[in-house]
Amino acid sequence: MPQPEGSALLSRPALPAIGITALGVYAPENVVTNADFEQHLDTSDEWIFSRTGIRERRFAAENEYTSHMGVRAVQDLVRRFPHALEGVDAVVCATGSPDALFPSTAALIAGQVGLRGAAAFDVSAACSGFVYACSVAQGLVAGGSARKVLLVGAETMSKIVDQTDRGTAILFGDGGGAMIIEAVPSGYGFESFVLGADSAGAESLYVRCVAHQLPSGAAMQPYLAMNGREVFKFAVRVMGESGHAAMQKAGLSVKDVDWLIPHQANIRIIESACQRFGLSLDKTVVNLDRYGNTSAATIPLALAEAYDDGRIQDGQQLLMIAFGGGLSWGATTLKWYDPLKHAGTAQADQALELQV
């Protein structure tokens, strides 16, 4: 399998000052505990928690879909930052569980939050999708195709997971996060991206629901299938390699990182990645125990939580890493711009002129 060091974007010059200036999140009200699975699966709270680190997760209602997760996350963003949607000219949604193959979930979200006319499209990279979408949004602003991007990571994984399969049912949850990506003052924002994929491992994690891929007369297979052992080995290796590559590209070392925000898939994967970095769990944001694996929404949910409780401070160095179906991986370094601390500043006057 190709190494992340050979991934796209590795040799790009320093990025212009573009970062996150607003954020919001949403998790459904329906809390599903490990004890709930004991009612219909051969499992227990102790068995699930010891192997995954998950205690509970949230499930969307029967009539709620991924666009609903995204819209509610955007509504939370607007509650926090009332003028955040002004001037948004592009909407990007990272999701592996879209409402439909088309129209895009991004288009549905845009229409429901009053952004009709904005460019809107989805990014499909499974659990790596949020990091991929950050790179896409950053590129839209840097290249002049947009001035302000609404980035959403949202999923309803409960609808594409077989709830009778112990190997996958216990892992996944639903939720969404929303962010504004735009120019920020010099010294803040995204510093590096490392993205990659290798379809040699595609059969280890997939949802095959496209009719023409099935043998004649075969039933549709709408549920996620996963080879947990293979995904675990891949994840531990690629998180370490892509994280180091992103830091190297930004001129950073592990000691420069204030917070690691990893994709929340399994506590054992996170612990193994931390060991490879030589990074303490105390410097790692983990909320897996309460939300499970929400795929492209895990990093937004974790980032917002750590920002809300005061762990993430203005100017701190963040490292975000994800892996997922493809098999894919993505890592980015980010100097955090605290939108509340800088509220009311003339951001446009402070930001450097964008040059690609």
What is the meaning of each model-derived region?
Residues P2-E62, D165-K233, R237, E241, ...:
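Condensing-enzyme catalytic core mediating Claisen C-C bond formation in acyl metabolism
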Residues R80, A84-R116:
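Anion-binding (especially nucleotide phosphate/pyrophosphate-binding) glycine-rich loop
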Residues T21-G24, A94, S124, V149-E155, ...:
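Short beta-strand segments
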Residues L41-S50, A100-G114, L151-M157, V210-G217, ...:
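Acidic-glycine-rich active-site phosphate/pyrophosphate-binding loop
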Residues V31-V32, F102-S104, V161-D165, W329-T333:
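Short acidic, glycine/serine/threonine-rich loops at helix termini
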Residues P2-E5, S67, V71-V74, S97-P98, ...:
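Claisen-condensing/thiolase-fold acyl-transfer catalytic domains that form or cleave C-C bonds
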Residues A142-G175:
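Flexible, glycine-rich active-site loops centered on histidine and acidic residues
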Residues A73-D89, E241-D258, A306-R311:
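Phosphate/pyrophosphate-binding loops at sites that engage ATP/ADP/AMP, CoA/4′-phosphopantetheine
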